[in-house]
Amino acid sequence: MKMHSRIFTILVLVAITLTTSLFIACGEDNTDPTPVTPPQEEPEKKPGDKQDEEEEDETEMSDTNYNISSIVFPIHRNAGLSETITIYPDENNLFTERVYSVRYDHTRPYMMPASLSKLYIEFNSDAKTIYIDGVEYKKNTPYDFSKPVTVTACADTGTEKSYTIELKNFTGLPIIYINTASGQEVKDKENYEDATIEIIGSESLPGLAKMDMQIHGRGNVSWTAFTKKQSYTISLSSKQKVLGMPKHKKWVLISNYRDKTLLRNNVAWWISSHMPGIKYTPRFQHAELILNGRHRGVYQVVEQVRIDNDRVDINEMKPTDTEGEAITGGYLIELDRMSDDTDQWRWVLPYLQGGSHQANIKKPKIDESNQAQHDYIKDYLFKVDKLLGTSEDMEYVMETYIDMPSWAAQWLVFELSGTPEPNGPSSWYTFKDKNDDKWYCGPPWDFDYQSFVPSTANQFRNKKYVYQPQMRKYQPYREELVRQWEAVQPLLPDLINYINEQREYMRHSAEANWFIHEQNLKDDESHQNGDEYIPSDMAIDRMIEYLYLKWDYVENNIRNLK
């Protein structure tokens, strides 16, 4: 009997220790000055003792009153919300929800992010005490939910249960706030307007502190035809990393106005980045744009095509580079049917698609101050254009003046995306470097137009354009096309996985974007892509269908392309 008594005494001491520790975890003070009376031996209790059963029932009841059945962010206490938000925990005791507000402009709704830094919260719980990140909860105190917080609910017995509250800011993508100095819409495509920018980062992408910048409109057809959601060029006051991309001042905000998938550029640039012949593919991220206080939808934040060590990595010329080796490069050249043909610094190339397209020198800036650079690059381009159009010695032309891997790879990126852009290029980028006679292609740009359409998959849509018929006269160039294709041909499963990952990552953003622009897209009469009237998910499935068809067609036909 003494042995039983000792065991009982030890068990009681352990129970007291555990209970005390639970009270400490729930914020109770265990510094009671009253001495603890040593436990006394109690008579052995018989099974079925009524008093014992009542005590057990009471303990069971008190140990369940720390559950939190739901949390509430009431609209009457949170001015930034458009409705009361009630959230229930999942099996892992996680409360998670995406928080935003809905506003109206001329009766048309649009979504806006709600501030998560000062929200009033209420709990549906019988817990005796609740702690938020270790501090006792008070109903009339706002809390910061911009980051995950830990909530601890304590029962009368001191038993506790922990939960996590993880609110998603708006769609989960970074949020760009731009405010122009005038407070008006950006209407000028040529001249910059002063503005400020601030970027609120996401879980995986860093933000940017508020700073000065300038903004103007950009695009050709996209600027004039799609006025409800336009694209912009921005210039920061100093070089900065933006959403994890290398430092620079110049960035582009692409609206992807007519792209129901919101992924056409993503997919084309994924293909480009896996082409060994492409020296540079623009980096990008997606973000929500709040311009002058209004949500404009999801935008693609892209590196502007510039001469830079992290972009088009060629020599950057100075105005004084006017002779010898210095004048040979580097030049960033855009083949552009949209250029102003009255501009004396742009020239029609007679053998580029029958003389219907121009060469537009993007860098260096060509004007009266550097006439020598103008004359050099004009003479070079006219010489290569004529040789491609008239020479009988294609070996000499191709081996001397054409970088075959980059021309083959860029043409193939456009062909795999199915866009007819090479037929009338408005953004076909090329370049020539210093001390290098060869003409290079890249980077690929502009894939939101008539691309990834299943009905166009069973053909080479662009085989007649951007010098391709002339270049294919040379057998090694045809072999280069096959080499570039064989580098990406096995990667189709990886590409499909990437598309589905992006589909999920962009899901809430797509919902918010088309909440604003669905009707605008339907009202656009061009309907270039053929998916304007179907949901985003179906449009993405349609894109995947196209890729399977196109991959099969190219694999079966590229080795016979003449």
Predicted segments — roles?
Residues 1-12:
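Bacterial N-terminal signal peptides that target proteins for export
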Residues 22-25:
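C-terminal motif of bacterial Sec signal peptides marking the signal peptidase cleavage site
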Residues 223, 227, 358-424, 428, ...:
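Middle-to-C-terminal accessory/interaction subdomains
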Residues 167-263, 267:
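Conserved NTP-binding catalytic cores of kinases and kinase-like/nucleotidyltransferase enzymes
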Residues 177, 231-235, 245, 250-255, ...:
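Structural recognition of the beta-strand scaffold that forms the well-ordered cores
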Residues 127-131, 274-288, 419:
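Short, well-structured beta-strand/strand-turn elements
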Residues 27-173:
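Beta-rich interaction/scaffold domains
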Residues 235-241, 248, 255-257, 277-280, ...:
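Internal "kinase-insert"/substrate-recognition segments embedded within catalytic cores
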